[in-house]
């Protein structure tokens, strides 16, 4: 978005929006992300990791459509809120899904690749914004926003061909399907392979531990867990408060 809001075409079409309006447009994505993050867990538990990502993609298509066709600030903000809702779901469920369908020895590297892909996608969008700046009129920013359809469509097409999470299948009582999925991932379909048996036992052990531990927000702060909770929360806080601020300050 930052590559678009400084273009003459955007400024002219939206009549040189004030700082408050620009702030609302910029923060709309984060607002939607908060809602998406809050509902991601219940949705994922209900329909599974894979289908929750597919569900989020539908909101991305709607949000992008609203942005491309927007005629005023309100519509643009609404479109970005919908896109943010998608970001909130996918940012939490994609790493979980990848970890649960990957072989144990490759989980770390696969999750890292996913994060690198996000950064690479951001870089591509900057170049797209730069390239579209040469287009005359509103087609400039509408074209840039329209490219957001492309990765989403590929994801929607490809997701049905990917397996469901074995851990989610076990959680909802679909044990046979979970074991078969594990076998396809770990041992080319051999359900008696030692790796498959060990992974299945691990899943059952974790599920029993979760059931015995119970649920509730108090768990995040009881028995010294507040330190781990604070550490996890601070990662995102430091990320958005340090380097981005330094870069923005040095470029302004």
Regions inferred by a protein language model and the residue ranges of each:
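Transmembrane-helix signature of 12-pass secondary carriers
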Residues: 1-183, 198, 205-252
